[in-house]
């Protein structure tokens, strides 16, 4: 009996698994330079950063292949290259860009609108997750990979703000009842120039009282002091010293004391 042997042919399956694997590989192989971990007492390095880092380092760094994805939520999508093949087998080089849209999405945690570029796929995922906050804060490793540098920074801001809301700085501050039945919260209990002071306002309010007084003092000697420089000067100053400084400027501390 004669057997008929058909030639072996490879058929291409209609699947995106190979494409997705290639995109994840482009993310996972990215690396960032190892940053030195400075400790108190270490020798002063030759290069000192000009300012403190505002965000933690993103594990997968920035993309050098599709750089515009570093400034939006692209979900790990990259530009794809290939060929258009005509009936005469002529190949024409072509590239396919992700479907990018610019949207303004409301963040409940940050209480503001976030305007950012994203792919249509990411926008659909955000709708499924129930908002951009849920999308950014999901703990899955795949979500961290697809966030990118910009998404990582937004995630840090959302998580930081959530922690501030859940754990305010004066959450356990004592509340006392005054003579007229009015209640007041004691933010600080300090001794200023030998006198005990129970302060009823927070640090931000104290800084707002001190800034115009410091600005006048700078102006008296022919110098200028803007608010940014003022915040840098007093960012790490203890509250006790801020109160002492206010008293040096003849500020009446009794107006903020109970």
UniProtKB/Swiss-Prot annotation:
Residues 1-21 form a transit peptide. GO terms for cellular component: mitochondrial inner membrane; mitochondrial large ribosomal subunit; mitochondrion. Its main location: mitochondrion. It is found in: Mitochondrion. GO terms for biological process: mitochondrial translation. Keywords: Mitochondrion, Ribonucleoprotein, Ribosomal protein, Transit peptide. One of its GO terms (molecular function) is structural constituent of ribosome. Belongs to the bacterial ribosomal protein bL28 family. Component of the mitochondrial ribosome (mitoribosome), a dedicated translation machinery responsible for the synthesis of mitochondrial genome-encoded proteins, including at least some of the essential transmembrane subunits of the mitochondrial respiratory chain. The mitoribosomes are attached to the mitochondrial inner membrane and translation products are cotranslationally integrated into the membrane. Present with 4000 molecules/cell in log phase SD medium. Component of the mitochondrial large ribosomal subunit (mt-LSU). Mature yeast 74S mitochondrial ribosomes consist of a small (37S) and a large (54S) subunit. The 37S small subunit contains a 15S ribosomal RNA (15S mt-rRNA) and 34 different proteins. The 54S large subunit contains a 21S rRNA (21S mt-rRNA) and 46 different proteins. This is Large ribosomal subunit protein bL28m. It comes from Saccharomyces cerevisiae (strain ATCC 204508 / S288c) (Baker's yeast).
